[in-house]
């Protein structure tokens, strides 16, 4: 079982990192990283201006560091979404659309092993992509603020890793429902960038309530550990300090719930999948 | 001894009944050709045997193991090539074969030897290190056949294996099937549209139409006593050893009377001044097929 899983993982990982999607994401992350490096040096002295309450004020180096990391993490938390869309959205639908299911379903291996191997391969390539951005971020940080990275940075990276597992599982779930890759791509984008945003606006505007249960809100913990400011115009509970321990735990729990529920449902669907 | 039991298998797609109460038992090595028109249910049957589809009713046992309930164990004995094969495009042919070999429990060194051997048999040696995304339709078909033979499975399921191949490729594919049947003693199930292909390769033929098995018999029982002779004839109307003689242009079709042999008929014809260009034995398969399939 373990051996078959590692074989499956290895081959799927190879198929992922040689794909056009991987090179497209690599290009995207290099462009974004380059842009962030430029912006970091260009607007270093204007960092406080990003937060309305701090505009024009002198701030401590510590807060400046936190703001710097907040802005990098803000962009970072969106990278896994794009990577997961590229790698996860077609994960199962492509087996049907590209007819590779006819090759893998007759193999003497559990479908759950196949799915989990592919899922971890997808998570791995997403981790590789985000790792490139993080390396550039760390180098830039060390140049700008010589010294050690704060502990909060490592917390943020840990939360990002959980988010990568979570968003990848979510895209696998969506992919398991469709037989066409395009439908899976569009659905993930629609849910994450339109439906979740619409729900955020409705809850925050009408009910002044933070819909913590939405995955994009939970993911924002990656940057909110530095400065607890939401970019939503209607956001409630903003604070210059980092997110509280309870906020971190709630976000973590939400991401884990998305992960577990999505994977379990995707497994059930994949296990019973038929290809006409 | 390997065995395949198809027990009361039906398959519904919504209101359409694609297969109706299919029963088949195969417990000796042989090649079974599944013939039938498009949409008859041939591929559906093969897909259920290989766990790509689940039966609506009934079950399939491979060496007594239910494919639907314990697919991992049941499929250990099966090699399959279903529909036109597609592979992960960024893996090479060698990696694709290694992936399957390793999943089938072969060691790294054992799988390397197996890959070389099967690539040589199927004629893909020169393409092994190319990504499968660059393969032509015919090369994918050959790779699919090589993949289906990995681990020397006891039962090989092939869905129109010669589809997309050039005439030489088709001949090579048929030769491989004959070798598998005669030397390796495997159970081979393969669907085809070509009666001539089934005749050449198979020991048994199943004719499927509208989701039902309409005919199931050994090829040897279908050998007829009809002949088709091409040559130049001089108004020949009667041959003592033959009946139902019909002449059409430079072609005669006849049925041998009981006790007559092909040689005796040909001798009679030559004694009557006929110059023979070619002789073709005719069996009942085509007749049976056309009478059953509407």
Identify the role of each PLM range.
Chain A
Residues 2, 39-67, 185, 193-272:
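Terminal transmembrane helical anchor/hairpin motif
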Residues 15, 94, 107, 138, ...:
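Transmembrane helix-loop junction
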Residues 18, 97, 110, 179-180:
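A helix-boundary/kink motif common to multi-pass secondary transporters
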Residues 29-86, 116-187, 196, 241, ...:
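Secretory targeting signals
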Residues 75-96, 101, 172, 180-182, ...:
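Transmembrane alpha-helical segments in integral membrane proteins
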Residues 90-123:
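Helix-loop-helix units of permease transmembrane domains in multi-pass membrane transporters
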């Amino acid at each position: 079982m373990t051996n078959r899983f590692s074989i499956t993982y290895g081959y799927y990982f190879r198929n992922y990192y040689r794909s056009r999607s991987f090179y497209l994401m690599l290009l995207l992350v290099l462009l974004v990283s380059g842009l962030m490096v430029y912006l970091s040096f260009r607007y270093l002295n204007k960092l406080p201006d990003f937060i309305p309450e701090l505009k024009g004020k002198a701030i401590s180096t510590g807060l400046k560091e936190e703001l710097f990391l907040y802005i990098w993490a803000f962009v970072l938390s969106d990278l896994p979404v794009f990577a997961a869309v590229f790698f996860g959205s077609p994960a199962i639908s492509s087996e049907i659309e590209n007819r590779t299911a006819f090759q893998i379903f007759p193999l003497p291996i559990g479908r759950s092993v196949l799915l989990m191997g592919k899922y971890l391969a997808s998570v791995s390539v997403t981790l590789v992509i985000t790792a490139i951005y993080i390396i550039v971020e760390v180098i830039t940080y060390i140049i700008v603020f010589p010294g050690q990275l704060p502990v909060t940075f490592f917390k943020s990276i840990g939360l990002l890793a959980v988010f990568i597992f979570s968003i990848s599982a979510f895209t696998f779930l969506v992919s398991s429902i469709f037989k066409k890759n395009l439908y899976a791509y569009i659905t993930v984008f629609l849910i994450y960038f339109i439906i979740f945003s619409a729900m955020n606006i409705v809850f925050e505007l009408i009910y002044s309530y933070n819909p913590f249960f939405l995955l994009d809100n939970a993911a924002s913990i990656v940057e909110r550990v530095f400065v607890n400011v939401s970019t939503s115009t209607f956001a409630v509970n903003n604070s210059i300090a980092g997110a509280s321990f309870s906020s971190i735990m709630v976000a973590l729990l939400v991401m884990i719930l998305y992960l577990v529920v999505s994977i379990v449902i995707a497994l059930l669907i994949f296990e019973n999948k038929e290809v006409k | 001894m390997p065995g395949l039991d198809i027990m009361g298998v039906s398959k519904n797609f919504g209101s359409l009944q694609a297969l109706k109460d299919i029963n088949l038992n195969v417990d000796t090595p042989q090649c079974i050709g599944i013939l039938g028109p498009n949409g008859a249910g041939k591929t559906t049957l093969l897909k259920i045997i290989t766990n790509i589809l689940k039966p609506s009713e009934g079950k399939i046992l491979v060496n007594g193991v239910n494919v639907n309930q314990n697919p991992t164990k049941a499929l250990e004995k099966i090699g399959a090539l279903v529909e036109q094969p597609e592979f992960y495009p960024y893996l090479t042919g060698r990696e694709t074969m290694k992936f399957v070999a390793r999943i089938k429990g072969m060691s790294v060194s054992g799988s390397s030897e197996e890959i070389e051997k099967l690539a040589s048999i199927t004629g893909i040696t020169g393409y092994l290190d190319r990504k499968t995304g660059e393969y032509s339709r015919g090369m994918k078909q050959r790779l699919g056949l090589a993949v289906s033979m990995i681990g020397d499975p006891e039962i090989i399921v092939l869905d129109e294996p010669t589809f997309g191949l050039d005439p030489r490729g088709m001949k090579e594919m048929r030769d491989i099937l004959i070798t598998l049947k005669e030397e390796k003693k495997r159970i081979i199930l393969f669907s085809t549209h070509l009666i001539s292909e089934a005749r050449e390769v198979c020991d048994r033929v199943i004719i499927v139409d509208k989701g039902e098995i309409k005919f199931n018999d050994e090829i040897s029982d279908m050998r007829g006593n009809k002949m088709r002779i091409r040559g130049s004839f001089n108004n020949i109307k009667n041959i003592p050893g033959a009946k139902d003689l019909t002449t059409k242009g430079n072609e005669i079709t006849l049925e041998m009377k009981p006790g007559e042999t092909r040689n005796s008929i040909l001798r009679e014809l030559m004694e009557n001044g006929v110059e023979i260009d070619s002789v073709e034995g005719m069996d009942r398969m085509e007749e049976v097929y056309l009478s059953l399939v509407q």
